[in-house]
């Protein structure tokens, strides 16, 4: 059976760390910041590590060959 292709959209959204965790940008920062709290805006800055079960799903379904 041939190798599964990596999803191009996932390549742009996720990065796998050296320890195997998955990093992604925080959601909810495209528009509508005026009604968000300053804490939300501050916490959503940069990237975050996905929870272990979510990271495993991303790698298995979208990034089978890593990056």
UniProtKB/Swiss-Prot annotation:
GO terms for cellular component: ribonucleoprotein complex; ribosome. Keywords: Ribonucleoprotein, Ribosomal protein. The keyword Acyltransferase does not apply. GO terms for biological process: translation. The keyword Transcription regulation does not apply. It holds the Pfam family Ribosomal_L35p. InterPro entries: Ribosomal_bL35, Ribosomal_bL35-like, Ribosomal_bL35_CS, Ribosomal_bL35_sf. One of its GO terms (molecular function) is structural constituent of ribosome. HAMAP family: Ribosomal_bL35. Belongs to the bacterial ribosomal protein bL35 family. This is Large ribosomal subunit protein bL35.
């Amino acid at each position: 059976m041939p190798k599964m292709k990596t999803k191009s959209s996932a390549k742009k959204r996720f990065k796998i760390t050296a320890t195997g965790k998955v990093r992604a940008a925080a959601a909810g920062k495209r528009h509508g910041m005026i009604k968000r709290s300053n804490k939300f805006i501050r916490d959503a800055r940069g990237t975050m590590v996905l929870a272990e079960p979510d990271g495993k799903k991303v790698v298995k379904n979208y990034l089978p060959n890593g990056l």
